[in-house]
Amino acid sequence: KGGNEAAEIGKLISNAIIRRHLETMQRLGIEYDFLPQESEILHLHFWDLAFEQLKQKGVLYFETEGKNKGCWVMKRAGNKASSSQTAKVVSPAPDGKATEAAAEGPDEDAKVIVRSNNTVTYVGKDIAYHLWKFGLLGRDFGYQRFYRYPDSRQVWISAESGEADHPHFGGVHASYTVIDSRQEDPQNNVIEALRGLGYTEQAENHHHFSYAFVVLTPRCAEELGYKLSAEDKERPFIEISGRKGFGVKADDLIDALIAAAQKEVDSRHAEMQESERREIAAQIAIGALRYFMLKFTKSSVIAFDFKEALSFEGETGPYAQYAIVRATNIFRKAGLSAEEILAGETDLRFLQEDDELWELWLSAGQLSSMVEQCIATTEPAYAAKYAFQLAQQFNNFYHKHHILTETDEARKHFLLATAAVVRRALIEGLALMGIDAPPVM
């Protein structure tokens, strides 16, 4: 409950961890606006308000027998009870108020929301939190400044009492909860609670952005310093387990990726300043990591591998980045900018020369459709696939057409415009995934 030395020490440690988390995520180009703390859901009585709603609407009932005796429970999401099980009788709750319980005896599969010792489960607090998210609770957090980014943008954190002047959070139209597939049942319970309370629209607009696990290839595990048994070396992947002490610190992974990328950059661009080479290596490394994590569908287990992620060939971030660098080099050698070419008049009759040219322009123009597909399916893998396929098409175009030595000026302008259109689509497509385009590679 706070107010003692142990609580103060705990707060000091947790705040230090949160700040380090923010710094690590910042390296990946990931930023936050607001950090809600679970403790405030109880301290600010969010749960008390949610509990009253849940009881009044009959979403929760008090169990008087069976393994859940003395608990407040709700029907587990997806559990289709028989007609005999759904018959209800009124049972007294500890507070003297009437509540309903199953007439045919206890539902042993019901989801416990409040334990018999009156402690609230994770799902219970999550229900209250989502009522706040949708502006259905009638109460708000206090807000305090917590962390400032280099551009002066502020991260806020919840508090029991906060600053009077703060941004507005909550009251959303749709909610996306990014949490792994093991939380499917708890998230379904949140949705069923919203529906049971009569908030049908909000239940439909609460999305569990589920994803599978990230593991390591044996080669990657060894590169990170782990000693593997002969048996482990033959396995397709090595699972990460915090409880077993087998894991990867995000900063260590990022550092290792940057170091590997910098070896390539140093060997190719020794004439550049070290700070420039370091920045380019970071862009390649972060791009490689983000692309690798996004190219798999959400239901796929991701077996991370350094060599595969940093490869300049195949479906990787560096492959897509290199296509942009290749296009940029064309304009540098031509003494023109891509923007100048796009501002000029382009004779599109040259599209009739080759089906591949038409397909390349068509693909470059499908960026918006790809974005809509990602949103509709909540599947970012489509963005990664789009970038790879467009880069692949552009590389085929690059090797087939001698752009800079083309003698027909109208056709040369058309070929330059083709490169400019594709370059723009690739830059925007990678930017949607949080990936920068380095000036050289």
PLM ranges: what are they?
Residues 1-441:
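Non-catalytic interaction-recognition regions
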